[in-house]
Regions:
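Residues at the starts of beta-strands that form the adenosine-phosphate
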Residues: 28, 105, 138-140
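Residue-level signal for short, function-critical loop segments
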Residues: 35, 112-114, 147
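Glycine-rich, phosphate-binding/catalytic loops in enzymes
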Residues: 47-49, 81-84, 123-128, 160
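The feature captures the conserved acid-bearing segment of alpha/beta-hydrolase catalytic domains
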Residues: 55-77, 86-129, 133
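Cap/lid segment of the alpha/beta-hydrolase catalytic domain
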Residues: 1-3
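Solvent-exposed, polar/charged alpha-helical surfaces in well-ordered, non-transmembrane soluble domains
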Residues: 6-13, 42, 97, 125, ...
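C-terminal catalytic histidine-bearing segment of alpha/beta-hydrolase fold enzymes
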Residues: 109, 125-128, 132-169
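Primarily recognizes the serine-hydrolase "nucleophile elbow" in alpha/beta-hydrolase
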Residues: 10-80, 90-91
Length: 169
């Protein structure tokens, strides 16, 4: 787990440190991913310590857009510990552990709760609620009705609208 989150954080830090070389705007960096990638996007930005290692404030991220990301401790980590995949855990490897009201704008996208894997919609709904309870104002959740875990293509217009609403270009 640590290696994966560290690699994802290093990749985001690289973008911050190099985006201007490619005529990009460091104020318009969005972090996204699907499934395990959504989990890594969440961990990289919600737990501010990961980007702080590179002298980057995680709140500099313009937006966070996980597609069907685990918000509890990832099932691979639970499996490594001998914990069944259906047993939810919230510890330092869970984005839920780090909920905070000052996080970047966030768009949570999941498949249909009846078709999505392992309660992923419910995890994201709880994350959404706890972020709101902690004062997060700019957070939305979308459940892609009729879609399972493979809802990414259907969700891309939501991502594009979210980015467009928060950028100059």
């Amino acid at each position: 787990a640590e290696t994966s989150v560290a690699d994802a954080s290093r990749a985001v830090a690289w973008v911050f440190n190099n985006i201007q070389k490619f005529n990009g705007d460091p104020n318009e960096i969005f972090v996204s991913g699907h499934s395990a990638g959504g989990y890594l996007a969440l961990m990289t930005v919600i737990d501010k310590d990961w980007l702080a290692k590179y002298d980057i404030d995680a709140n500099s991220v313009a937006g966070l857009i996980p597609f069907s990301g685990h918000t509890i401790t990832h099932f691979t980590i639970r499996k490594e510990r001998g914990i069944p995949g259906e047993q939810p855990i919230i510890d330092k490897w869970a984005p839920l552990y780090y909920v905070r009201g000052d996080a970047p704008p966030t768009l949570l996208i999941t498949g249909d709760r009846e078709k999505e894997m392992l309660g992923r919609y419910e995890e994201n709904a709880y994350f959404y609620r706890m972020m709101k309870v902690n004062g997060q104002k700019d957070i939305k959740i979308y459940e892609m009705d009729g879609y399972g875990h493979n809802m990414t293509a259907a969700g891309f217009p939501l991502l594009l609208n979210f980015v467009k609403e928060r950028t100059k270009n």
